[in-house]
Design a protein with these regions (language model features):
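Beta-strand-rich domains and repeat architectures in extracellular enzymes and scaffolds
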Residues: 30-66
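Asp-box/WD-like beta-propeller blade repeats and closely related beta-sheet repeat scaffolds
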Residues: 109-192
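Short, solvent-exposed loop/turn segments at conserved positions within beta-propeller repeat blades
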Residues: 60-65, 108-114, 184-190, 236-242, ...
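Cap/lid segment of the alpha/beta-hydrolase catalytic domain
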Residues: 234, 400-536, 543, 576-578
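Predominantly five- to eight-bladed beta-propeller fold
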Residues: 15-20, 65-66, 154-196, 241-242, ...
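Conserved beta-propeller blade repeats
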Residues: 35-50, 86-104, 126, 132-149, ...
Length: 685
């Protein structure tokens, strides 16, 4: 379907501002069905080639498919797929001589079973299968001597692998963090580090048996072992502390740090004397801007080398271990006010970081080898593509988004800043905000407005392709988004501005105070700046913390809105702490737990204001959500129903907290249709 055809689907006629239900369905199917993105770039050791992963939606089959692609780094030849893309292929990793590429595949019909393969590149040979693991394979790395391939995989307790739960043993629970959203129970299937001979002559060997989870394994330069991150201390479930560990191929695991902070994403130096990593020193305060550190193995001491840039090096897209490009230089990426850039850092911290990429876009992952920087980057009107940067010059290698652009004609943002809604002294007192004009925009008309609030709250909106905004704008809505206090991408004080009022280190306003003021300030500014935004037809929506904000605004400022959609929300802070898969970290964010300060948790809870809700509400929640459990939605729905409020509740079976991002394609399209129908009905002229 071409862009002109999509405009017809959007139905932006002379008298209509939003589309009809049948058009909503087709619009949702068109945009969801064309979703595609590149990721996980891997540069060959000599810098000549780049491998990456392309993931696309197959709407007809209601699934996702991914395949590994390969291109010359100089763009001299068109990229080509290395795998068929009929399954979920990923995690490419080069052999040290660049002649083999390891990758994973979900080709098995058994749920969770994943295979690890190596494929010859530029030479004769056949695909070789190294391992078949029952519970996933990730973080694939080739040892520097070429003899081993390492990976992570969950080790299952046989007591809980039976076909029928009636035969399973009862689970003995003694710690928090027993379950994880999207994974289910994890304490009885911890993630371990495995190695397998690269020639396939032996079975994989588990290097980290036991109850502790190990992540981010990276090889020492002499191939004698790996460095990982794990929480193995007493009371590990009561704080955010994680230590770096040395995991030898033979011998005992040894901690390299001593529970003084949260340290992860290790990267040993080329000479083996240091380990770069991402983290921070205080495991009892969150959020903090994650920094790049360098640990001296001889002394056990570390220094922070990114302090010249007060931004987080653990981005909304995730964190990636710093890459050494020499004995004294590192490359890492960090967020910056709605963008994410790659930076070069002095490994001593003597000079400030220098940006290697720029522009109004978000880099989502990167790799460096052989003098070539490869990035996976997205901008608002184009999905994530692969580019190389050599000598400051960029070259785009992939073009997988061409069909999406042709079929859906993505729209662009207008960025603007707004003064904070209440006093702020930690940095520039301004909020980054964006507005997207409706498709077929006519300045003489007035359009309904949808105010979006992101989750987290310690994440950011920004300069990247976002299907939510594209769908809403294509349906005829003006789309407003912002990064209020509490968001990431700014100085640490910005993120910590809404820490709990009694937090022992960095007390803030708590949730539901400065953040609310900022969101409303952005809405006021957008309406004042743009006469084509109709202030009498404003809707609001958000998910997770954004759902929290939606319910809070419904109770405190419902008169500002015609309708509000609250998705996967936190509605009751007290019950959220005792039921969420990560609820026990609330105290590092808010200070006391709910047992020590129930009054403050009640003050921050949107459910407290349910009697004051007068605006129609749509509640959307996933039945397998462990981050914000279904009970959060049920509490709000039951309360509103008992009070005779206007409320509609949709439950998505089999989905988790990630419904809007990686839920089944059919459910993602149905969700869009439900949201568009709701706001078209309530925001009609």
């Amino acid at each position: 379907r071409g862009a002109a055809s999509l405009a017809a689907v959007a139905g932006a006629g002379a008298r209509e501002t939003t589309t009809t239900p049948s058009a909503h369905r087709e619009l949702a199917d068109t945009i969801v069905g064309h979703q595609i993105a590149c990721g996980t770039p891997r540069v060959s050791p000599d810098g000549r080639h780049v491998a990456w992963v392309v993931t696309r939606v197959d709407l007809k089959a209601n699934t996702y498919r991914s395949q590994v692609w390969l291109a010359h780094a100089d763009g001299s030849r068109p990229p080509r797929p290395l795998t068929a893309g009929e399954h979920r292929d990923g995690n490419p990793s080069w052999s040290p001589d660049g002649t083999w590429l390891a990758f994973t595949s979900g080709r098995s019909e058994k749920k969770g079973e994943t295979t690890l393969h190596v494929l010859p590149i530029g030479s004769s040979g056949e695909l070789r299968t190294l391992a078949t693991m029952p519970d996933g394979v990730g973080h694939v790395r080739w040892s520097p001597d070429g003899r081993w391939v390492s990976f992570t995989s969950r080790t299952q307790d046989e007591r809980y692998t039976k076909d029928s739960e009636a035969w399973m043993a009862p689970r003995k629970i003694e710690t928090f963090f027993t379950r994880l959203n999207g994974e289910g129970f994890v304490f009885d299937r911890p993630q371990h580090v495995h190695v397998v001979p690269a020639d396939g002559t032996a079975a994989p060997r588990n290097l980290t048996p036991g109850t502790a989870e190990h992540g981010g394994p990276e090889w020492l330069p002499d191939s004698s072992g790996l460095v990982t991150s794990a929480a193995t201390h007493e009371g590990w479930d009561l704080d955010l502390a994680t230590d770096l560990h040395l995991v030898p191929l033979h011998g005992e695991i040894r901690a390299l740090t001593a529970r003084t902070g949260s340290y992860g994403d290790p990267s040993p130096s080329p000479d083996g004397t240091r380990v770069a990593f991402i983290g921070y020193d205080d495991p009892l305060t969150y959020p903090q801007n994650a920094r790049v550190g360098v640990l001296e193995l001889a002394t056990g001491r570390h220094r922070w080398v990114s302090d010249g840039l007060d931004r987080t090096f653990s981005t909304t897209s995730g964190s990636i271990a710093p890459v050494w490009t020499g004995a004294g230089e590192l490359v890492a990426f960090a967020e910056d006010r709605g963008t994410a850039r790659v930076w070069r850092l002095d490994a001593t911290g003597a000079t400030p970081p220098v940006a290697l990429t720029g522009g109004r876009r978000i880099v989502k992952s990167f790799d460096v080898a052989g003098g070539v920087l490869a990035i996976a980057a997205s901008q608002v009107d184009r999905p994530t593509e692969i580019l190389t940067v050599v000598g400051g010059e960029e070259r785009r290698l992939s073009a997988v988004g061409d069909e999406l652009v042709r079929a859906t004609a993505p729209l662009a943002w207008e960025h603007f800043t707004v003064p904070c809604g209440s006093p702020y002294a930690g940095g520039p007192a301004e909020i980054d905000a964006w507005i997207m004009r409706p498709r077929d925009f006519d300045p003489a008309r007035r359009y309904p407005v949808l105010l979006n609030v992101h989750g987290g709250p310690h994440t950011q909106y920004g300069e990247t392709y976002f299907d939510e905004a594209q769908v809403q704008a294509a349906a005829g809505f003006a789309v407003v988004m912002c990064n209020p206090r509490g968001s990431s991408g700014r100085e640490q004080a910005w993120g910590q501005a809404i820490l709990g009022r009694k937090h022992p280190v960095a007390p803030g306003t708590g949730w539901g105070d400065a953040d609310v003021a900022d969101v409303l300030a952005v809405l006021d500014a957008a309406l004042a700046r743009h006469a084509w935004c109709d202030p009498s037809r404003v809707g609001m929506l958000g998910g997770s913390y954004g759902g929290y904000m939606a319910t809070m605004l419904a109770g405190l400022h419902g008169e500002r809105f015609r309708a509000i959609c609250s998705e996967r929300a936190v509605n009751n802070m007290i019950s959220e702490e005792w039921s969420s898969d990560i609820g026990t970290v609330f105290r590092v964010e808010h200070g006391p737990n709910h047992l020590d300060d129930a009054e403050e948790y009640a003050r921050m809870s949107p459910i407290r204001h349910v009697r004051d809700i007068s605006v129609p509400m749509l509640i959307i929640h996933s039945e397998e959500d462990l981050r914000c459990p279904m009970s959060q939605a049920e509490e709000l729905f039951v309360a509103m129903r008992l009070l005779g409020k206007d409320v509609t509740f949709y439950r998505f079976p089999g989905e988790t907290h990630e419904l809007s991002r990686s839920g089944s394609p059919i459910h993602r399209a149905q969700r869009f249709e439900i949201i568009l129908d709701f706001f078209a009905r309530h925001l009609a002229a």
